[in-house]
Amino acid sequence: DQPDGGGSVSLTYSKEVSIDLNKNIVSLLFANPGKSNQDMIVQIVIHDSVIVQSGLIKPGNQVKTLDLLDSSEKKLTEGIYDGKFNILYYDQINGEKAIVNTEIPVTVTVEKWLQ
């Protein structure tokens, strides 16, 4: 339980992210556990550019693949990048964006996989 006006957040994630430039698909693990009381959006940021953004992730849900944002593939070449998850929190009742965000360092491997 949290105090009135407070929040409780719990995260499950992997710090390894991979991107397939042939399909513009991002493979990751990010979950908003059922005990959380906040909705979330996860972004992946490389070199201060948001390259991926999920939709709203409600407690008890997770994402394993996302599409690159339009033209993000033009900013990337094959290699390993230091990136970050940028987590945005939203109140489940009124949908207001929370003031606090979370940044988590991740390693992003960019490849062109065979079809």
Predicted regions and their residues:
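Primarily secretory-pathway and cell-envelope proteins
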Residues: 1-45, 93-115
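Beta-strand-rich extracellular modules
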Residues: 84-92
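Short glycine/proline/serine/threonine-rich loop/turn segments at secondary-structure transition edges
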Residues: 72-82
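Generic structural detector for well-ordered beta-strands
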Residues: 56, 67, 107-109
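Residue-level signal for glycine
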Residues: 48-49, 73
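Exposed aromatic-hydrophobic patches
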Residues: 62-72
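Solvent-exposed serine/threonine-rich low-complexity stretches and specific carbohydrate-binding patches
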Residues: 49-61
